[in-house]
Curated annotation (Swiss-Prot):
Main location per the UniProt record: membrane
SMART domains, sorted: AAA
Species for this entry: Buchnera aphidicola subsp. Acyrthosiphon pisum (strain APS) (Acyrthosiphon pisum symbiotic bacterium)
Subcellular localization, as worded in the UniProt entry: Cell inner membrane
The name this protein goes by in its record: Zinc import ATP-binding protein ZnuC
Amino acid sequence: MFEFVKLKNVCVNLSHRSILTDISLSLISNRVLTLIGPNGAGKSTLVRIILGLIKPNSGTIIRSNNLSVGYVPQKLHLNTLLPITVERFMKLSRKTNNIKIEEMLKRVKAESLKFCQLQKLSGGEMQRILFAKALLNNPNLLVLDEPTQGVDVMGQLALYKLINEIRHELQCAILIVSHDLNFVMAKTDDVICLNNHICCSGTPETVCNNLEFISIFGLKRVQELAIYHHNHNHIHNF
């Protein structure tokens, strides 16, 4: 296993308010780490720190020299007055070509969408296109912000199956930010529950049994998660 990014005791303050306190984590090859927490917990700020978009007030960030990041945003804001095809959108990435674009679209099973208008894609189709675009630079770190938002259940299962295939093929680290606790607990290796600080972390089972996690999400919700995880502890074939 290889650490692509490591945070040590990272703190962020904005307008004299503590946003993140004493955050330490590692993003490791071939492992999926999922970040959960209530609104205002600092998840977006932590992602921006990891992406290098903002600097912390204190703490240490160590990135591997060969770090290459692929980012799938939570939502793509499109100007409906400026129609754009999937192919043209993919070409907005630097250092790409038609062969690479076709390869990535095929990899995410979206080659049939190449000449479609982005504005006409379903939620699941759009996520596949964003995923394909993120793969163009052969990332060793994939950051996925709410990847299942606006995607139906079958699409979510297929998307997580794809994520699992990609991480094994590329041996990349994957960070997922998600509110969908059901799929988080069934499809991730490690979980960090954030509420301006790290409330708890570890395997999904460990986090589900943590009192601070239960306090944030409620006992009933945690019990539902336990039932869901039990009923889905097997492999779906699509």
